[in-house]
Amino acid sequence: MVFILGVNFNEHKLVQKALESFYGLGQQASARILAKYSIHPRAKMGTLPPKIVTALTAELSTMTIENDARRLVLDNIKRLRDMGTYRGRRHAMGLPVRGQQTRNQIANARKLNKIERHG
């Protein structure tokens, strides 16, 4: 098991997929980190030397990921709601925010936009 930022990863997991499992890191950011440390995209977690693992941990600790990224998104939504914008009201009602039709297919938006609705 390889330990990075409080998460244990299996030795057989790809490094790129392990990095993408952190909230706020996508394919491009993980590919950029791999290129920075000269890690092959198909490399597994178990093949990394401890020096690279500590460098990855240091790199990830400087980035806005996990709870910090979630808090940033929620703060942006709260800011929209407090300003009283159209998007903020749509978030508050749990409706689609980006102009989608609401006649039939809003079930997904109602699932994803679950926020405190009153207050």
Curated annotation (Swiss-Prot):
Keywords: Mitochondrion, Ribonucleoprotein, Ribosomal protein
Localization terms from the record: Mitochondrion
Gene Ontology CC annotations of this record: mitochondrial small ribosomal subunit; mitochondrion; peroxisome; small ribosomal subunit
UniProt record similarity statement: Belongs to the universal ribosomal protein uS13 family.
Function: Component of the mitochondrial ribosome (mitoribosome), a dedicated translation machinery responsible for the synthesis of mitochondrial genome-encoded proteins, including at least some of the essential transmembrane subunits of the mitochondrial respiratory chain. The mitoribosomes are attached to the mitochondrial inner membrane and translation products are cotranslationally integrated into the membrane.
Biological processes per GO annotation: translation
InterPro entries: Rbsml_uS13_C (IPR027437), Ribosomal_uS13 (IPR001892), Ribosomal_uS13-like_H2TH (IPR010979), Ribosomal_uS13_CS (IPR018269)
Pfam families noted in UniProt: Ribosomal_S13
Subunit description: Component of the mitochondrial small ribosomal subunit (mt-SSU). Mature N.crassa 74S mitochondrial ribosomes consist of a small (37S) and a large (54S) subunit. The 37S small subunit contains a 16S ribosomal RNA (16S mt-rRNA) and 32 different proteins. The 54S large subunit contains a 23S rRNA (23S mt-rRNA) and 42 different proteins.
GO molecular function: RNA binding; structural constituent of ribosome
Protein's UniProt name: Small ribosomal subunit protein uS13m
